[in-house]
Swiss-Prot record:
Cited Pfam families: Aminotran_3 (PF00202)
Protein name per the record: Glutamate-1-semialdehyde 2,1-aminomutase
Keywords assigned: Cytoplasm, Isomerase, Porphyrin biosynthesis, Pyridoxal phosphate
Primary residence: cytoplasm
Reactions accelerated catalytically: (S)-4-amino-5-oxopentanoate = 5-aminolevulinate
Subcellular location per the Swiss-Prot or TrEMBL entry: Cytoplasm
E.C. numbers: 5.4.3.8
InterPro entries noted in UniProt: 4pyrrol_synth_GluAld_NH2Trfase (IPR004639), Aminotrans_3 (IPR005814), Aminotrans_3_PPA_site (IPR049704), PyrdxlP-dep_Trfase (IPR015424), PyrdxlP-dep_Trfase_major (IPR015421), PyrdxlP-dep_Trfase_small (IPR015422)
Organism: Pseudomonas savastanoi pv. phaseolicola (strain 1448A / Race 6)
Pathway: Porphyrin-containing compound metabolism; protoporphyrin-IX biosynthesis; 5-aminolevulinate from L-glutamyl-tRNA(Glu): step 2/2
Amino acid sequence: MSRSETLFANAQKHIPGGVNSPVRAFKSVGGTPLFFKHAAGAYVTDEDDKRYVDYVGSWGPMILGHSHPEVLDAVRSQLEHGLSYGAPTAMETEMADLVCALVPSMEMVRMVSSGTEATMSAIRLARGFTGRDSIIKFEGCYHGHSDSLLVKAGSGALTLGVPSSPGVPAAFAKHTLTVPFNNLDAVRDLLAEVGQEVACIIVEPVAGNMNCVPPAPGYLQGLRDLCDEHGVVLIFDEVMTGFRVALGGAQAYYGVTPDLSTFGKIIGGGMPVGCFGGKREIMSHIAPLGPVYQAGTLSGNPLAMAAGLTTLRLISRPGFHDELSDYTRRLLEGLQQRADAAGIAFVTTQAGGMFGLYFSEAREIVTFEDVMTSDAERFKRFFHLMLEGGVYLAPSAFEAGFTSIAHGDAELKLTLDAAEKAFAALK
């Protein structure tokens, strides 16, 4: 029995499912989840001392690679001054100033401790600002696990949302309206019907929780225009895309300005953190300036601020995101070439330093329906074959992959060599 198998068996005694976040359990791909004990650069090492090229990157934060020395030094330095104060610090202001400088739509910022807190708070703020109750989200998009967002579309063209998880009251879900991603006509029709009741539209500008689905040309600007027409707050959930697809996030990459944005992952440099912000006119409604309540004991935690500030400064150097995107492009081109050579139906997507892999006959991936054409069983086999070859991919056919600046030619060769063998075995 491997060390990971032993640890997983022990973990299940007191941790539900043996993990603290469901995707880690390998339910989508089968087998025993790997337990890691070390990470450095582009690699993670499991409890059995096997090393893997990592394309999960802690689900996005590790854009510099793991254990970047300057980030670790910043955390160590702050560690000597205390873990948490429950009071304002200079670093919080530095972080707010830097985020507002990097993302022009951000005029004011509130720090929180997770992406879920950020999206939950942004939606509450939008409701408080507009005096409206309903929100619009998109099929296949994930915005954290707060009750009003664990909702899927019901039947019919225009319907109230229904809970997608036990424990979410139907009374909460009825205010969440779900429409297809990348379908502007569906949004237009819905707003024509109930626009006066809608507080906000929340969208992942790149849908990263149905693998990686970029927006169709004109889609994000179309949402912007519709929100302006109906007095609806446009929220970009950039927890995944922020500072990754471009330094200014997806909003800079695609040239569309939201009213509010949420961030997480990279902004904490690997520490638990998130933030939301946007127009001063809207953010002024948050307590203590305004009546919309939001608070957090560990918000603006100094260790997280130290890691996040250092990370954001390091990724701000000229050419950083071009290098990241170029590696990702070469990776996907190499995978596509090897899949084609093996006669395997395969298509990839990319947005900067994030990517999607689909075992599909579809010519392109644009909609949720396109995503669902991917052969999940074939992905399972591919995942384990790549694992045997020393490559760690996201353990789900519906999660995005991530590259880091630590990935280079050696990691590319190892990955593509493993993929060539894996594709051959899939015939």
